[in-house]
Structure formats: C-alpha cells, structure tokens
Amino acid sequence: MARRGAAVAEEPLLPSSGIVGIGPIEGINWRTWLVQVFCFALTTSVLFITLVTASLPQTGYPCFYGSLVDYTQKNHSVVDGVWMRQIAGGVAPTLFLETTSLVAFLYYTTLVLVAISFYLIISAVLVRRYARGKECTAVAGCTRPTTTLIASHVTLVLGTLATWLLQVVILLLSHKQAVLGAAVYVVHFVSLVFFCMSFSGLGTASAQYSSNLRILKTNLPALHKMAGPGRAVMTNLGMGMLGISLPILSLMLGIILANSFHITLWQTVTVAVGVFVALGLMFLIIVELIVSHYVHVLVGPALAVLVASSTLAVATHSYFVHFHAMVSVQAPNLATASKAIVGIMAVISIIMLVVRLVRAIMFHKKRNTEFYGRVKTVSSKARRYANKVRGPRRNPQPLNVAESRGMLLAEDSETDAEEPIYDVVSEEFETEYYDDPQRVPERSHRREYR
C-alpha cells in the first residue's frame, strides 16, 4: 500500500491494491464518462464541419463569417466626432481583426478542440483495455480514478458547452448578426475559461495531482503516458487556444458597446485595447501562479499572447490608416498610445515566456528528473555535432604535432564536461518519487536514457 507523502494532505485519488474488478458505482461512472466523451467528440466534429462549410461560398451561407467589418466603404456617420447621429444616418465600422487573422484563430481553436477529443477517445480505449486486463489487479477499481486523471465530468460538460457556443457564433456571423454573435462569444469565452482551468488542474491540489501521477506511473505506465506527458501537451494547446481568444473577446465587447450606446469612435478603440491588455496580464499571472504548478513546461500561454498582441497591432494599424482623419480630430494621440500599449504587452509576454522556461529548467534540475536529463543529453549531442561540422572549416590547413595534441586535449575535456551528469538519482528524489518503501523498483538506481 502506498504511504502518504509528507506534503500531501489528502488521501490518494488512486486506491491501493485490493479487490479486483469494478463495482456498480464505478460501472455507472464509467458509462457516463464514455457518453460524455462521445458527446464532446460529436460536438467538435460538427463544429469542424460547420467551420469548413461556412468558409466555402458554394455551401449556401449568406455571408462569410470572417468579413465582420468592411473598411473600404465610405463613412457617412461621423459628424463632429459623434456616431449614428440622425443627421448623418449611417454607421461607422468598429475596430476588429482582419479576415485572415479571425479565420486563422477560429480554425486553431477548432483544431485544438478536435485534438482534445482525439486525446479523450484514445484515453478511453486504453482505460477500457487495461480495466479488463491483468494490469487492473494492481489498482482496485482503476476505471474511475483513471478517467478522473484524464478529464472530469464537469470538464467534459464545459468543453461541450464551449464547443457548441462557438458553432453558434460562426452561424450568427455568417448571417451578419454581429451584436448577437458578439454576445454569444462572450458566453463562449467564459465557458472556455472554466473548461481550460478544469482541464489543467482537474479540480485538485497540485501536490495531490503529482502524487496521483506517481501512483499511476507505478501501476499503469501506459495510461500514465496519457495522463502525464499527453495532458501536458494538451494543456499547452488549450492554454494557447485561450490566449488567442483574448483579442477576439475584447473586440467583440467593442462591437456590443458601439451598437448599444452613443459613444465616439476613439472610445471603442480604447475599450478594446484596454480590455485586451487587462485580460492578457491577468491571464499570464494566473498561468504563472496556478497552472504552472501542474504543467511546468508551459510555453503555450505566453506564445499565444505574443501572437495575439502582434495580430491586434496589425489590426489597429490598418484601422488608423483608414480612419486617420476622424481619429486625429477626436483623439490625436490615440494611434501612438494604442500601438505603444500593445507593443508593451508583446514585450511582457516574451519576458513571461523566458521566466517560465527558466523556472521550468530550475525545477527539473533541482529534482534531477528524466526530462532534464534527456534535455541535457540532446543539447550535448547537438553541440558535439555542431563542433564536428564546424571543425574542418575553422582549420582547413594541416596542423603540426603540438597544435594537434592541444586540440585533442581540449576536445576531450569539452566532451567530458558535456556528458550528462544526471544519470544517478539522488536519495531525496528516490524518496519523493517512490512512495512505497517495500516495493522493489524494476530499474536500478541509475537511469537509462533512450
């Protein structure tokens, strides 16, 4: 029986060795989880089909969802810097992403949701396979805790809701219902936030999450690949999906304000840029303080915010070019201030990316993990290969005996310094990694890297 670690206050999610098989409660939970996985996969498939068909002019959709605003038409609505006055009788277009950017972001979101559905299907197949095999004898009732480590029931419900709402947004934008589509997108974003956070943390503490993964790796290593490294990849993709949704949300709020209140053109731009910066900073802080405890190598959020900032900067530049006269009258410094703020946001995302990578390396180096050992091995091999390729180019002429002997000594010392030094695991890591002192590990104390 696995003993409780000093840092874990809860009982392990995975039960210890005992009765073999699945009880009635676990059976109901397993079938319900399968139905939810099927519904999520079906919803993502329908979303992908809807997105593809809405992109083709031959399918019968009245409009293209990506062309939400048109800056080419002459504006007749601005009189003394005020929108929608009865004297003018027109509507000025609001700031929004360019067509290619919006289409790319929606396709990325859809493909990530499809990838998560494939991840869940593969995990369900593996769970069913090992639940009926001899491997299940090591963990009593392994179906229920393993599915909880893949995705909880609440996570699947939130994911299905977010996917369906995104499909509704695409249909509304295809019929040019911009305000209603923007309102639905706000609800979609809220559900997407809860889905990504629930998928990342599984509703448990980070210490308990790590303990469950260690127990799962000991008893069911095949499923550990899905619950451990597989979830890390899906978490990076999911957080990236959430990051690129930030500019769309901020601009959707601008559309709602512009079509609901009597405001000027510069105010909608200010609201959109301000909301994006505020949500972007909050997103990066939450990822660094909370999500990074579950997945340490987490580069998706910072990269997503960087891409989102660049895309929003391009959109604002194009907007100010088309409406330079009106913006210069209402707010002369708006263009410069908006570009500077978005640029600062991009720089902050780069800084947070570097901070996350440094902290991840320090974490794995301190614990002498397999990940850090493999990274050192790959980097040393790449450096030796680069030196081998560049060596003949730096010394095209034959060397004398002294120079040859000096180069050989330097090469030997460099090679010795680059050999991985993390093959032997420290006693502290052995105590932390293996909770059961009576279990004899199959491996020796020296790690093997493939």
Swiss-Prot record:
Q: Name one Pfam family in it.
A: Herpes_glycop
- Membrane-crossing segments per the record: 32-52, 102-122, 154-174, 179-199, 237-257, 271-291, 295-315, 335-355
Where is the protein localized?
Answer: Virion membrane; Host Golgi apparatus, Host trans-Golgi network; Host endosome membrane; Host nucleus inner membrane
Q: Which residues point to the Intravirion side?
A: 1-31, 123-153, 200-236, 292-294, 356-450
Main subcellular localisation: virion
Q: Which family is this protein grouped under?
A: Belongs to the herpesviridae glycoprotein M family.
Question: Can you say what this protein is called?
Answer: Envelope glycoprotein M
Source organism (scientific name): Equine herpesvirus 1 (strain Ab4p)
What is the organism lineage in this UniProt record?
Viruses, Duplodnaviria, Heunggongvirae, Peploviricota, Herviviricetes
